[in-house]
Amino acid sequence: MCIRDSAMAEQPDYVADVDRLTAHCDAHGVALQTIKSVARCRWGDTDPHFSWYEPLAPGDALRRAVEFVLANPRLFLNTTSDARLLPATIDAAQRFDGRAPDAAMLAQDRTEHRIVSLFDGGLLEGTR
């Protein structure tokens, strides 16, 4: 199981680790589950939520986040723990046409929706 989203894909060391893990799983016939694919950012110190991270809202950015994972046939997409997004996630998966989303559109999504890596070496990772 690993995180697979466009923000983490900007981190070369992480990408190399995931590529090695994917190849290992593929060689052994093991499915590689992905998590946090529709994550936008960590929630701040606010009221309780359905997940510990803020997911993308239903729409084109969420659809592209789903497509980003599904474009790699060796990966398995897990849905967010926020069940309210299940219909939008399933719809995006059903509409997936086999093509990876455009890298420029993913970059635009990261900017417009302020998508950031959930793991930044901070408090959650025990390094602060």
Tell where the protein language model's regions lie, with residue ranges.
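Beta/alpha (TIM)-barrel catalytic core signal, keyed to glycine-rich beta->alpha loops juxtaposed to Asp/Glu
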Residues: 4-127
